């Protein structure tokens, strides 16, 4: 798949939070402008859509708050005892299924309620599978998840 005639990576994830993420918002760069946010509401029907992760309060910062989210609802920045943390790095470090989460204090535990699975960029495997079940072709599915990109034969590129 290409964007402006250039071969590009096409990221995928298991299950979005109902909308995929915009590359420019995530990477703050025009180079990833080809990754457009699209609705993938069918993902919300998956049995794996919501996931709870419980972590003992003792191992977390005393103050932990979401500072910023992107347009798809994924946490991009958190404040941890006054320090700014990047959302996706926090997700990976804490073993969360998604950076689209809410934080709840429950007794001596902190509950992270996560929507979706993975980074949420590009192709949703669950959403793509559901589109295929509805007789959409591979080309139609890729065009849906990568609307600004073009499918080209490799011989056309090189």
How would you label these PLM feature ranges?
Residues 1-158:
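Conserved, single-site charged/polar hotspot
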């Amino acid at each position: 798949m290409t964007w402006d005639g250039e071969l590009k990576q096409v990221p995928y994830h298991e299950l979005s939070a109902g909308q995929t993420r915009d590359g420019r918002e995530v990477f703050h760069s025009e180079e990833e402008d080809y990754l457009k946010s699209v609705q993938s509401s069918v993902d919300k029907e998956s049995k794996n859509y919501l996931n709870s992760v419980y972590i003992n309060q003792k191992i977390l910062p005393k103050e932990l708050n979401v500072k910023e989210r992107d347009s798809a609802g994924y946490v991009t920045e958190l404040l941890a005892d006054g320090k700014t943390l990047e959302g996706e790095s926090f997700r990976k470090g804490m073993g969360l299924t998604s950076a689209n989460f809410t934080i709840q204090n429950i007794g001596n535990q902190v509950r992270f309620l996560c929507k979706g699975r993975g980074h949420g960029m590009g192709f949703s495997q669950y959403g793509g599978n559901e589109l295929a079940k509805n007789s959409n072709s591979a080309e139609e599915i890729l065009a849906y998840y990568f609307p600004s990109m073009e499918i080209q034969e490799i011989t056309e590129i090189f």
